[in-house]
Amino acid sequence: VKPAPFDYVRPTDLAGAVAALAAPDSKVLAGGQSLVPLLSMRLAAPSLVVDINGVPGLDTITEVGGGVRVGALARHTAVLESPLLARVQPLVPAALAHVAHPTIRNRGTTVGSLVHADAAAEMPVVLRLLEGSLDVEGPAGRRTIGARELFVGPLESAVGPDEIAVSAFFPALPAGAGVAFDEVARRHGDYALVGAGAVVDGDRIRVGYLSVSDVPVVVDLTGVAPADRADAALEHLDAATDIHSTAAYRRQLVRVLTDRVVAVATRNATAQGGGR
């Protein structure tokens, strides 16, 4: 299938990109790994595509106060292989290792995945679990959207139609804390049937889940007995039956993955001096 006709512009600065995006029915193109398939299937039919790949300075990965800021054009591969993120917030590369395949990671962007807001994708639940944020630029200037407010529905984010996401902020892992991420998919690189990430910080235990709700879900399991954690999590999840899996199998995967990621995150915390 071929895309419906559209106009194309490639601005050379952020102000020009924001101005171009003011046109009706316009869409931003960064890595294109979500938008281009939607165009090809005519599930998206913008009148104008604004390609931001000509805007300098959006591909950086930098340490800032309390964490790491990832630019809108930083490719998944660069984020996955970043020594800075491996040191400051290892949950990000741990999850990115499960994202698609190398050819897609070489082009796709981490920030683009956040804006796409697919609840079956890894990056939205990671940002939500880490309580990170997204910076966006629009006609009214720049604003920050917290992860709790960012994901508002299936494939729907709080980024306005006239705004461009410029960077994501991933908070640093607290000293002595541990993280883990795992998922189950029919084939490596496919969308997960269920995925889970955990952050264990002292006595605090939080687990985030993908593919079991319309939006990324984070459950605080602090103080919950190990045998009861999965049941406590399932109260907040919506494991549905579809062509990929039954609801019963997804619930079983929640049980397995909850125990697994909490155990691994606890071991990682102990290894970093955060013994419990």
Task: Annotate each language-model stretch with its function.
Residues 1-276:
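C-terminal structural segment of proteins
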